[in-house]
Amino acid sequence: MTISFPKSSHPTGLHFFTRNPHPKKEDHGDCGVRALSLATDTEYRFVKHYADDAIAQRHDGDQPVWGYKRLQTSYGGITRQEITTTLNDMAKSDRKLYDWIYVSYKTVFHKDNLPEICIADQDNHVVCVKDGAIYDSWDSRGKTKKLKKVIGVWCHRDMWQKFMDKHNRDLRTAGVVK
């Protein structure tokens, strides 16, 4: 179901809604878990469980100088590979997540450059984008007219196809990428 909002006055064309699915409303480096939870409509604790497992498997305590707690939980951040692993692991028990993919493409953070429902990878932050609005615990759209860079998105394969069809399957000609 697509929700339509009035035109946004922000340079990104996106609206902002404060949403923090963390049970205690804490905000401490768990942007990947928040974005996954909000974009996939999956309960935060389930996403966190799978994310922590992906992080533990990837690091396996190989870098003790970073600190034990940071490496063992998603509160210390999560990499692109760990987000993809988390989605793949979640898909084993939730079929609707099976066709989520990561698409790498360089663009700017603007409504017209993103699929309707996706997780935008802003290099040092990931954020849930749904129907022309971002959903996060803080406003990551930026405070200046210069648009932030996006280096890729996670989205359902059907959303990506719809996005590509909207731009006649040529993102360069459509001005989405340069």
What residue ranges belong to the model's regions?
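Low-complexity, intrinsically disordered short peptide segments enriched in small/polar/basic residues
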Residues: 2, 14, 131, 147-150, ...
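Active-site nucleophile-adjacent alpha helix/oxyanion-hole segment immediately C-terminal to the catalytic cysteine
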Residues: 1-75, 80-81, 175-178
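N-terminal hydrophobic targeting segments
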Residues: 1, 111, 117, 121, ...
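Conserved active-site-adjacent core of cysteine acyl-enzyme catalytic domains
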Residues: 55-124, 130-139
